[in-house]
């Protein structure tokens, strides 16, 4: 009988501890504009890899092209009972001279998230192919060091209309 109570205590402690560790996060953390511009300055996939994993992203695929390599990371999230996959692509030139960060999601309104952070940037005319699409609304910004494209694309989903948000950050 002496061993019964401590055994029950430890079993309950183990069950409650594991329950607390498995709760699903209700927040979906995205990097700030300052963080995105810092990453674009890295020109190093290794440094980027360490920091993006801290936000819950996992490496998915590496794609080599003629002048650059793209590293794609994904994060699966559930918000209000709906499953989403966030994607971030780190593209770096083969000579490590430039890099571009591209983030695509439907889980969070990136326009609302990033617009207040872009007050120090100049709003410029968008010349990107995405901005010319009639279903896409884009705002383009520039500072002395970076160019940022922020888009809200109306897409037809199988269960109705939805938004797909896109932000791209490049060092000038």
Regions found by a protein language model. Give the residues of each.
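Bacterial Sec-dependent N-terminal signal peptides
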Residues: 1-29
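Hydrophobic, Leu/Ile/Phe/Ala-enriched alpha-helical segments that form helix-helix packing faces
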Residues: 13, 48-59, 117-125
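Long, charged/polar, surface-exposed segments that mediate recognition or autoinhibition
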Residues: 83-141
């Amino acid at each position: 009988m002496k061993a019964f109570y401590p055994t029950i205590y430890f079993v309950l402690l183990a069950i409650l501890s594991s329950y607390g560790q498995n709760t699903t996060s209700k927040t979906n953390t995205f990097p700030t504009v300052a963080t995105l511009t810092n990453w674009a300055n890295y020109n190093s996939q290794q440094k980027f890899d360490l920091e993006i994993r801290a936000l819950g992203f996992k490496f998915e695929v590496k794609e080599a092209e003629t002048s650059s390599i793209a590293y794609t990371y994904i994060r699966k999230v559930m918000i209000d009972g709906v499953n989403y996959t966030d994607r971030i692509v780190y593209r770096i030139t083969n000579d490590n001279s430039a890099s571009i960060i591209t983030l695509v999601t439907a889980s969070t309104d990136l326009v609302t998230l990033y617009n207040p952070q872009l007050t120090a940037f100049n709003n410029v005319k968008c010349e990107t192919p995405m901005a010319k699409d009639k279903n896409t609304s884009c705002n383009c910004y520039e500072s002395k060091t970076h160019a940022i494209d922020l888009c809200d694309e109306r897409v037809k989903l199988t269960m109705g209309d939805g938004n797909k948000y896109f932000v791209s950050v490049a060092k000038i």
